[in-house]
Amino acid sequence: MLRAALTTVRRGPRLSRLLSAAATSAVPAPNHQPEVFCNQIFINNEWHDAVSRKTFPTVNPSTGEVICQVAEGNKEDVDKAVKAARAAFQLGSPWRRMDASDRGRLLYRLADLIERDRTYLAALETLDNGKPYVISYLVDLDMVLKCLRYYAGWADKYHGKTIPIDGDFFSYTRHEPVGVCGQIIPWNFPLLMQAWKLGPALATGNVVVMKVAEQTPLTALYVANLIKEAGFPPGVVNIVPGFGPTAGAAIASHEGVDKVAFTGSTEVGHLIQVAAGSSNLKRVTLELGGKSPNIIMSDADMDWAVEQAHFALFFNQGQCCCAGSRTFVQENVYDEFVERSVARAKSRVVGNPFDSRTEQGPQVDETQFKKILGYIKSGQQEGAKLLCGGGAAADRGYFIQPTVFGDVKDGMTIAKEEIFGPVMQILKFKTIEEVVGRANDSKYGLAAAVFTKDLDKANYLSQALQAGTVWINCYDVFGAQSPFGGYKMSGSGRELGEYGLQAYTEVKTVTVKVPQKNS
């Protein structure tokens, strides 16, 4: 569970209830400068330079310094990757002939290799992304392993049915792989989003062309090496680093791609959907932005609600699509909640992500850094009350002070738009009917949460809120077994759980004439 991560970096009395075996286990000391082994394009189980020979820098967000140059894939490289994937998916190929149980064993093997290299991958993730190393190790890598192993178990268990149709006929269904799956992953959880995409696609027998985020390409590329080591046939997984308008657009519009799965902003999701529809009507799964309401009722456990609301917003430097970024607090506990939330934000440790005491590292890059500061300025200009933070937290790197706004109104920019940073907005409400209307008055619908001791209130709100996930008295609790996805402009389709397999299969009906049917 994500919430367990907090205990590793901050073990005060109020967090005692969060302690778990994962959080108390020893975390190996990291290498602060892990060597980069993979920075090219991975096609057909081989490493390639870009056709154009272009490269781009990937930057350490803690310092602003370049880590290394990475091959910059574009349309020509995507064409090569799709060609390799289509060859791997041909009838009679080793991948198509492989038993489903063997596909599962390959996924188990991949998870084992990632676990073997867990310390290295966690350090590389922290170097390239900026998230605290203990979070990379205890949370991200733990969830990667659980996701891959969960879908490995599904490989030979997701199947069709026999159907008793009328007449002398025998009818059954097959769950067949869609084919070539384009997958475009974001920079906020590079390894985890790679696992969310690869797990169900490979378990069901598909082949993959993946574009990794230009801000954080290094860990996903290293996993490509492990995919080859695990024994996946050439062409089954191909990984192209590059930029959205070139490599990403080429995947979304490619006639040889049968499905595209994208995690990222709603704005880019629109472009993906249009490109998919105007090309070959490929299937689309979108996990997009959010402005999730976190509702604190007056009867909530105040200690727990304050800590969880802090976690809901500030976890991962606020760079979560499902962040609890609209904190609605019932009026008779509003002042106390605000006071305690400000105190908690002021105590949040911001700094070197390799330091085990650090709770918050830098934002991912300069673009995000400047965008977040712009939202903070907007909040001040529109009349929200800046209660703490509001500026840069270091002389170099992309660190931002934990920021809290009070007296936030629904019409303010910071209450409507996804900030994607460590900026908490606290809003006041009176009645449960009022907060339902205000919480649902958003173009987004990814997640929501309710804190209350009253089960009737919790049940009512969980049904009334327009969100794909509703947490009750907790936040950011994920499991590979539970589906995740959004309502409205937060996306379409579901990832994780059994539901996550549906997007990667076609259901084929086969009907056979028989001489005589007997029950």
Swiss-Prot record:
Primary enzyme class: oxidoreductase
SUPFAM superfamilies listed in its UniProt record: ALDH-like
UniProt EC number: 1.2.1.3
A single GO cellular-component term on record: mitochondrial matrix
Residue ranges annotated as motif SIFI-degron: 12-26
Active site: 287 (proton acceptor), 321 (nucleophile)
CDD domains: ALDH_F1AB_F2_RALDH1
Name of this protein: Aldehyde dehydrogenase, mitochondrial
Encoding gene (name): Aldh2
